[in-house]
């Protein structure tokens, strides 16, 4: 059995990129999704190579974990956080505590940099031993039937560099009250999907940007990401999308990822939430997380939900 007595945990180097990609492929049954997600993370402005850690034994790379910096919303505050994803250990070395060493070291480094929360989607019997609490967030949706197509559909096009400030303002307006909401970022690539079947679009009214969506071509009535200036705009966006479909309007029911605390939700209908056991969070420093979780568990506050960054569109 391989020995773990000489495990070295260190930040990645550029020369590790090929080995890290191959490691994730082997650990995930030759899937290429995880290597691609790691590579895309490195193109983010917030990427920190000191939070991309490798485990080495006798000069051989046997493990890797990535903690990606984000800004999340919790109880009305913006909290510096990290997302643990992905993590991989060489199959021959699994079950020997290497993953735990990577996680613990990542927690210490992230905390030293001022990050207060770590969150992830993972196995609910493994991660709690490192301080993660299950059912920390989940998903939400609002069902919106298409009542009558708008006579004047909105202008629709791909996002451009000059749209990013308006997109950030739109996100702030729509999502600032939603717990666990993730700020997408201030670069164009934060708003463009790397998945060839998922299109990012902006919506304009009289030249003003009023909406944004990311939609999979096979799920046109189930946007993955939906931001609107207000409820009227949301209806106009749905109508504009519907005009491009061949289905009869009366048969269309849109599932929008609104949360009960989304700015536009109340005027559109009832948004419902579902918690996930695999959705976990861990406090790295003093933060609103314990109060948020206590309120959620006492049913005094709706459970939060993130709309995931574009690079996770690859994880289909």
Task: Give short role names for the model-derived ranges.
Residues 59, 89, 97:
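Conserved G/P- and acidic residue-centered "switch" motifs that form tight phosphate/ATP-binding loops
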Residues 134-227, 231-232:
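Amide-forming acyltransferase catalytic core, primarily the GNAT-like/NAT-type
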Residues 50-54, 64, 86, 198-202, ...:
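Short hydrophobic/aromatic beta-strand element in the GNAT-like acyltransferase core
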Residues 133-149, 228-231, 239-316:
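Active-site/acyl-donor-binding loops of N-acyltransferases
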Residues 2-69, 77-83, 148-185, 220-221, ...:
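Short amphipathic alpha-helix that is part of the acyltransferase structural core
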Residues 92-105, 115, 232-241:
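Conserved acetyl-CoA pyrophosphate-binding loop and the N-cap/start of the following alpha-helix
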Residues 85-94, 223-234:
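A short, internal acetyl-CoA/4′-phosphopantetheine-binding micro-motif in the GNAT/acyltransferase core
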Residues 107-122, 247-258:
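Conserved GNAT acetyl-CoA-binding A-motif
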């Amino acid at each position: 059995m391989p020995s773990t007595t000489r495990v070295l945990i260190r930040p990645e180097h550029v020369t590790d990129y090929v080995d890290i990609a191959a490691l994730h492929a082997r650990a995930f049954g030759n899937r290429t999704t995880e290597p691609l997600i790691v590579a895309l993370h490195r193109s983010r402005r917030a990427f920190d190579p000191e939070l991309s850690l490798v485990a080495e034994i006798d000069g051989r790379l046997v493990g890797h974990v990535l903690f990606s910096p984000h800004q999340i919303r919790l109880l009305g505050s913006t909290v510096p956080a990290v997302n643990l994803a992905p993590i991989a250990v060489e199959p021959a070395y699994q079950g020997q505590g290497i993953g735990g060493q990577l996680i613990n070291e990542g927690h210490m480094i992230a905390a030293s940099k001022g990050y207060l929360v770590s969150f992830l989607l993972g196995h609910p019997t493994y991660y709690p031993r490192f301080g993660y609490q299950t059912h920390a967030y989940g998903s939400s949706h609002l069902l919106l039937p298409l009542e009558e197509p708008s006579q004047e559909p909105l202008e629709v096009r791909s996002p451009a560099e000059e749209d990013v400030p308006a997109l950030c303002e739109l996100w702030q307006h729509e999502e600032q009250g939603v717990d666990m909401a993730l700020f997408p970022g201030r670069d164009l690539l934060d708003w463009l999907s790397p998945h060839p079947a998922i299109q990012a679009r902006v919506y304009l009214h009289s030249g003003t940007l009023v909406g944004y969506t990311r939609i999979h071509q096979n799920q046109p009535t189930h946007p993955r990401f939906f931001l609107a200036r207000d409820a009227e705009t949301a209806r106009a966006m749905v109508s504009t999308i519907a005009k491009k479909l061949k289905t009869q309007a009366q048969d269309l029911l849109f599932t929008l990822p609104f949360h009960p605390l989304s700015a536009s939700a109340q005027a559109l209908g009832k948004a419902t939430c579902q918690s996930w056991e695999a959705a976990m969070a861990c406090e790295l420093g003093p933060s609103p997380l314990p109060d948020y979780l206590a309120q959620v568990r006492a049913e005094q506050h709706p459970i939060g939900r993130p709309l995931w960054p574009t690079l996770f569109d690859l994880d289909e």
